[in-house]
Amino acid sequence: MAVKIRLKRMGSKRKPFYRIVVADSRSPRDGRFIEAVGYYNPLTNPVDLKLNEEDILNWLQKGAQPSDTVRNLLGSKGIMQKYHEARFAKK
């Protein structure tokens, strides 16, 4: 099972917000997911982004692949840097 960390669209028409979820890559965008690990609201100023860092690092170490947008969001919070440091420190 290929697992992805991606955005699940929520909200109403023209007022989206997103949950950051861990889901099977074959499931639909707004369909079934394994675990919700945060949320992202691009309409607020400043942008509202809340992430469960421990769960995200755990899923990344298990092999979950973030989508391009989620990778950028994780990078802005420094989570990708922590993941790379932990990954290459073991070797």
Swiss-Prot record:
Keywords: Ribonucleoprotein, Ribosomal protein. One of its GO terms (cellular component) is small ribosomal subunit. InterPro entries: Ribosomal_bS16 (IPR000307), Ribosomal_bS16_dom_sf (IPR023803). GO terms for biological process: translation. Pfam families: Ribosomal_S16. The keyword Cell inner membrane does not apply. Gene3D superfamilies: 3.30.1320.10. GO terms for molecular function: structural constituent of ribosome. The keyword Flavoprotein does not apply. Disulfide bonds: none annotated. PANTHER family: 30S RIBOSOMAL PROTEIN S16 (PTHR12919), SMALL RIBOSOMAL SUBUNIT PROTEIN BS16M (PTHR12919:SF20). Belongs to the bacterial ribosomal protein bS16 family. This is Small ribosomal subunit protein bS16.
